[in-house]
Amino acid sequence: RSLPLQKKVYIPKIVPFDGAFGVFADSLPDGWGRLLVDRMLLREHINPHEIDILNRLAIVGETGMGALTYRPVHKIQSEKAQIEYDRLAAECRRILETEYSNDLDELFALGGSSGGARPKILTKIDGEDWIVKFPASLDDPNIGLVEYQYSLCAKKCGIEMAETRLLPSRQCEGYFGTKRFDRVALNGHVKRIHMLSVSAILEVSHRIPSLDYNTLMVLTLELTKDYSEVEKMYRLMCFNVFVHNRDDHSKNFTFLYDTEKGGWRLAPAYDLTYSNSIGGEHATCINGNGKDPALADILIVADKIGISKSKAKRIAEQVQDTVNDELVKTGILHNMRYSYFR
């Protein structure tokens, strides 16, 4: 809403995106991707703090998430074709611990435009675009397996997700991979899909907890005009509560633009795993409760957006029962809780 289609000059606020509008800030790498960009700049004897938003977007060029591209393109990486996941994971660990890496060029080329805290690369698998994640320095070494198990559980809960795989490793149980939902193969070409995160739409920082699922429900209805999309968001909220996914910040919810229908829809869910946020609470509150949300809080959120109590309760119980079967009874949730607090 900060950029309506009117012939006027609009000046962005400095906060929260350092002088960028949300739609463009979404293209900028954060977390791991920004770390790679800054390390590459330092290697070229450039102070990262002196690089403004426009130049950072030029570095993203045509490699960013979603459909937006930026010109002119600043190229500061080389390209390599061979991908060895264990070796790249080892280089990721080096970068997280120090500024040295033999494969900084390759890692930047593969993951320099990605967001999120965990190391990741953007790559091709069977000719299609995928994201492959590696453990961060404080992660359980088998976090890839856990995220894969979470993805299987989410799908059984009725949550839409892109295709996921557990990629083989000799160092751990495997690396988590997911097909990109902002790229679609069409008649031998790759079509880029417009996407916007909730952070970009509402222009709020994902680093500061400021949202409630009540807001997400209203936003989903306003953008999509479709109650089935609202129910998708509700189901995702239930899942996040029951599986202890508390890093549910504003960049972990995204909408895709459907050019054929001329409207927005909720993107497939992503970044679903055992996690905590600031103070161990949910980054997005459930009816004001981020610490210990209960079924009563969940049902109030549903009621406020107009989902019937019977349907809301049925969805919540179905999700909870599936989580119990797939993650609780199998010990996966308990093991992750132990891993976090040992």
State the predicted function of each range.
Residues 1-250, 254-342:
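Phosphate/dinucleotide-binding and metal-coordinating scaffold of catalytic cores
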